[in-house]
Amino acid sequence: MAYVLSAHAETIIQEREIAPAWLDAAMRAPDLLLPHESDPTLHHALKRIPDFGNRVLRVIYNATKEPPLIVTVYFDRTMKGKL
């Protein structure tokens, strides 16, 4: 799936050593897709990452952009054991 990274997302991915394959998996086939609570243009794609202790990767992206613009990405501790 094609997407664009914001400058913030690029920085976070490098700092936290988030593998591109994990990001691709979350965007291509999320385990859970949620709307943003206050911004209808944003979606949250959540993906359990077995290669990283089954932690849940949360990718927040602007779905109105073509290709989608990834705003931020992080491992969501609040989702541990929920997916």
Which residue stretches match the model-derived regions?
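Ribonuclease/tRNase effector modules and their secretory precursors
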Residues: M1-L83
